[in-house]
């Protein structure tokens, strides 16, 4: 089943990033992500209770018992929003390194090198392209996230906001990471999305296990490069290059 093929790529990606030839491309973004994680978690811990209170609906006294049922949903909602923010910021900062990591993983998997050799000059040259692509992802993400955020404040409707955020998050994990190998091959944004939709169930399987792994504090720092490697395996084995010739 396609949905079951997705999760295995993350596990294989984790094994791949342990190879000596790939460690440089893992350690640099890992260090940057650690700094982002520390800053964001410190801020989130200070504001967490306030955010939950802000999102919680105001219930009449006779329904006050429902707070014990509804409160965990809004705690989960805040955690999901914090997770999205960290993932978005960390991936923007690490984008050029993630692009190079994806290239090198593809070299290992295919057994041939069709990419320019690594150099700091080449890395600098990649920054405008990778940052442009990250901004395109942001433009895709923000309007949809804004709709979900508005729903989170609508009494009654906000009860379904958490599962909708989770489903959207799973899809975005597939978009975020599989885009690295797609962008390396100069596949256009709309073409990339169309290809992902054609592999929807496999994408949701990969995105789902990646989403869960990235929710675990500290473990998520290692799983981000593993997700890049796993997404590259996804691209190769699901024959992403076929999308280039359409």
UniProtKB/Swiss-Prot annotation:
Membrane disposition: Multi-pass membrane protein
Gene Ontology MF term list: high-affinity sulfate:proton symporter activity
Membrane-spanning ranges: 24-44, 69-89, 148-168, 214-234
Keywords: Amino-acid biosynthesis, Cell inner membrane, Cell membrane, Cysteine biosynthesis, Membrane, Sulfate transport, Transmembrane, Transmembrane helix, Transport
Main location: membrane
Function of the protein: High affinity, high specificity proton-dependent sulfate transporter, which mediates sulfate uptake. Provides the sulfur source for the cysteine synthesis pathway.
Name under which the protein is recorded: Sulfate transporter CysZ
Gene from which this protein is expressed: cysZ
């Amino acid at each position: 089943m396609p949905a079951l093929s997705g999760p295995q790529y993350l596990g294989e990606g984790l094994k791949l990033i342990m190879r000596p030839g790939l460690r440089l491309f893992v350690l640099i973004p890992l260090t940057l992500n650690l700094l982002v994680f520390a800053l964001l978690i410190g801020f989130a811990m200070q504001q967490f209770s306030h955010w939950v209170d802000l999102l919680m609906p105001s219930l009449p006294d006779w329904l006050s018992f429902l707070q014990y049922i509804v409160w965990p949903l809004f705690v989960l909602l805040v955690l999901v929003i914090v997770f999205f923010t960290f993932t978005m910021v960390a991936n923007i900062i690490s984008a050029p390194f993630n692009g190079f990591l994806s290239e090198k993983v593809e070299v290992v998997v295919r057994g041939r090198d069709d990419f320019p050799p690594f150099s700091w000059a080449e890395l600098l040259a990649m920054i405008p392209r990778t940052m442009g692509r990250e901004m395109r992802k942001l433009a895709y993400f923000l309007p949809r996230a804004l709709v979900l955020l508005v729903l989170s404040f609508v009494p009654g409707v906000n009860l379904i906001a958490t599962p909708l955020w989770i489903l959207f998050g799973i899809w975005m994990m597939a978009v975020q990471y599989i885009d690295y190998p797609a962008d390396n091959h100069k596949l256009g944004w709309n073409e990339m999305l169309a290809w992902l939709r054609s592999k929807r169930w496999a994408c949701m399987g990969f995105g789902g296990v990646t989403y869960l792994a990235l929710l675990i504090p500290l473990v998520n720092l290692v799983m981000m490069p593993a997700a890049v490697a796993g997404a590259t395996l996804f691209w190769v084995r699901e024959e992403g290059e076929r999308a280039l010739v359409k």
